Amino acid sequence: VTVLALDIGGTKFAAAAVTADGDVTARAEVPLSRAGSPDRALAQVVEQVTARVPADAIEGIGIGSAGPLDPRAGTVSPVNIPRWRDFPLTAAVGRMLPGRPVRLAGDAQCMALGEWWRGAFPEEPEKPGAAAPEPSAEAAAGPGEGPRRAGSRAVLGVVVSTGVGGGFVLDGVPYLGPTGNAGHIGHITVDPGGDPCPCGASGCVETVASGPAMVRWARAGGWTGADARALAASARAGSAIAQAAFRRAADALATAFHTAAALLDLDRVVVGGGVAAAGPILFDPLRQAMAENAGLGFTRRLRVDATSLGRDAGLLGAAALALPRRPPDTRPGAAPAVPE
């Protein structure tokens, strides 16, 4: 079984052919700055992949996109990509590869699902004699999006890049919400009097912790670099203002993560995206802020890790959306259905 996975981020459009074992057999990527119209960008990546994997071998299509999105209508409206607003993505893909099922979810939802399926979540041994918890209603009754990983029942995936997006995987099932937009953690308010956000609110996490927001703040303090990658390099070189920008972003992210953990009893947060590629410059102050601000006891067990799959996490999660499922096992303690 081979499926086509599509991943639309703030700066690039990626595609891959992925097998049921999670092997990537072909891939393509187009920078959105040079991609032209959405239809042209889609055509470029699909044509590059199908030049290496015959189109008739592709049995389904999974898409992860920056949001908001409308899975029922098949449209995407990424906040930071104006030309993609209300673009009928699933219909456009369906015209290129007719007759295949198409599934759409948020890019961070797919990243979390990809990590759950093929990533390196630390596994925690069960306590001796402990009974396995019953699966959630979604895991027992739903179609079974994604496999379960021991020790990580409730995962938040976060993409920190041009924007800040999020998505939940609970008991192996992406929780999408009634409109498909659950997990927009970048639009939790962390500073009510803060900068206006493109979403229409003010003081969102995204206005503090996204790459462009960090760069704007540092420049206001006298830094003269070009972008978030240069900001990370300056922080590593000892620039006080660059380091402060990362600490400020880390504080905002820690507040948002603790908020989500208090609501959903999370045990893992997996962070990816261009800003997360800064490594310890971001994760050291983030983990410090998490430790200093933990409140309720159960939130102190929350673990924050960088994605182990890098840029492939979103593609693998999108593939998992499209792969065939085994029927769910509804016995107590059974894992939800997984890709065959």
Question: Can you say where each PLM-predicted feature lies in the sequence?
Answer:
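A charged helix-plus-loop insertion that forms the helical arch/lid used to bind
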Residues: 74-86
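Glycine/small-residue-rich loop that forms an oxyanion/phosphate-binding "nest" at active or ligand-binding sites
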Residues: 103, 109, 113-115
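Short beta-strand segments
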Residues: 7, 62-66, 105, 156-163, ...
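ATP-binding/phosphotransfer module of carbohydrate and carboxylate kinases, centering on a glycine-rich
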Residues: 1-60, 70-73, 91-101, 117-152, ...
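Short acidic, glycine/serine/threonine-rich loops at helix termini
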Residues: 115-117, 169-170
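Generic beta-strand structural signal
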Residues: 100, 153-158, 162-166, 170, ...
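Residue-level detector of high-confidence beta-strand sites
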Residues: 27-29, 79, 113, 177
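Structural signature of FAD isoalloxazine-binding scaffolds in flavoprotein oxidoreductases
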Residues: 181-184
